[in-house]
Amino acid sequence: MTKRTASIKRQTTETTISLSLNLDGTGQADMCTGVRLFDHMLSQLAKHGLFDINISANGDDIHHLVEDVALTLGKAFNEALGERKGIVRMADATVPMDDSLASVALDLSGRGYAVMDLSFAKNDLTGFPTDLVRHFLETFAIEGRLNLHARILYGSNDHHKAEALFKALARALDKATSIDPRREGVAPSTKGMLEN
């Protein structure tokens, strides 16, 4: 099987990012964005999706940093998926974390789109603005060329809501990126191909 990996470096006047991704990893995470909560959430994505992800990033403000990491990570997923032949393609996951429950459904269709139903009681999670959770997911979906529906069903602790959401994303991505041996070498589409 061809290695499904990507390495991307991105440098702008606002951010500097170096990222590597292995879709067929073991959940190894090395995150260094300078934002501890963001590193924690990105680590959930690696650990529970069984992806090996290394990210080194810094930026002039948290909004630019989160946006550009999402953009770069989305591009890495798209690149690592290649022509998307043999993948399961569509998957969903519902994940609890104590008081909170989150659900993610996605389609690695080659068309970026995001629908969000997220609510947080506060505007900030220990220095991480909660609106950036939505922005991260939307940017990741568009750049990763996947259709993403994400929902926080309920919860009383904002940290738990966000963590359940990232874990649900990880589990759904793990399933959708998996190779189905019955589809080996074939795009999972009646069109015979998926956009990439």
From Swiss-Prot:
Keyword Cytoplasm: yes
Chain segments annotated as coiled-coil in the UniProt record: none
GO biological processes: L-histidine biosynthetic process
EC id: 4.2.1.19
Reactions that this protein is recorded to catalyse: D-erythro-1-(imidazol-4-yl)glycerol 3-phosphate = 3-(imidazol-4-yl)-2-oxopropyl phosphate + H2O
Amino-acid biosynthesis recorded as keyword: yes
Keywords: Amino-acid biosynthesis, Cytoplasm, Histidine biosynthesis, Lyase
Disulfide cross-links: none
Broad class of enzyme this protein falls into: lyase
Position of the signal peptide: none
One function term, GO molecular function aspect: imidazoleglycerol-phosphate dehydratase activity
Subcellular location(s) of the protein: Cytoplasm
GO cellular component: cytoplasm
Pathway assignment: Amino-acid biosynthesis; L-histidine biosynthesis; L-histidine from 5-phospho-alpha-D-ribose 1-diphosphate: step 6/9
NCBIfam families: PRK00951.2-1, PRK00951.2-4, PRK00951.2-6
Family named by the database record: Belongs to the imidazoleglycerol-phosphate dehydratase family.
Name assigned to this protein: Imidazoleglycerol-phosphate dehydratase
Organism expressing this protein natively: Dehalococcoides mccartyi (strain CBDB1)
